[in-house]
Curated annotation (Swiss-Prot):
SUPFAM superfamilies associated with the record: Scorpion toxin-like
BP GO annotations: defense response to bacterium; defense response to fungus; killing of cells of another organism
Disulphide bridges: 4-52, 16-37, 22-47, 26-49
Name of the protein this chain belongs to: Defensin-like protein
Cellular localization per UniProt: Secreted
Organism: Pentadiplandra brazzeana
Amino acid sequence: QDKCKKVYENYPVSKCQLANQCNYDCKLDKHARSGECFYDEKRNLQCICDYCEY
């Protein structure tokens, strides 16, 4: 069983529009495994940091 947590970060939309900016921020600033942008239920772009450990 792996320890897995995903943390929702509120990032400016501009960061999600730049290629992989969210991914870089999650890795460099948050020490996460990766990051990705997605639309929430209000159609706002969010950045989610993936802290899953394998």
